[in-house]
Amino acid sequence: MEGGERINEVKIKNSEIKQIDLNLVQVCKSICKIKYSNRCGTGFFIKLYLDDKELYCLMTNHHIVTGGNIESKDIIDIYFNLEKEWKKIKLDSDKRFIIYDIDIDITIIGIIPEDNIKKNFFCYQI
C-alpha cells in the first residue's frame, strides 16, 4: 500500500456466502441466448407483478427483436447455458410488448413459459 491507504475489511458469515452462491446460480439460470429472424442476442428472464398478476417476460435489446417486426404469434428460440439446449418460447399475445425504449435499446416481451422453464424466472423479480 502506498501513502497510508486503508483497506476496509468486512467479516462475512458462512450462511451469507451460501446465500450469495444461491443468488449467483439463479442469475445464471435467467440468462439466455436469443435467436429470432436471423438475429442473435442475449437476454434474461424477469417476472413482473402488475395488478396482482404474474407476468413472465424476456428482457433483451430492442434492436434484436424489432428488426424482424415481431408479432404475437411468433416463437423465439432460447438457449439456456446451464442446460445446454435450445427451447422455443411463445410470445404472449395479450402482453407482448410490456416495455420498450429505442433510446436505451431495451425491450421487455411478455411470453408464455412452459412449466419446465419457469424455474429460470425467479431471479430478477421487479
Q: Where do the model's predicted regions map?
A:
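N-terminal activation segment of mature serine protease catalytic domains
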Residues: 2-48, 58, 104-107
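Serine endopeptidase catalytic core focused on the charge-relay Asp
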Residues: 26-40, 54-55, 62-126
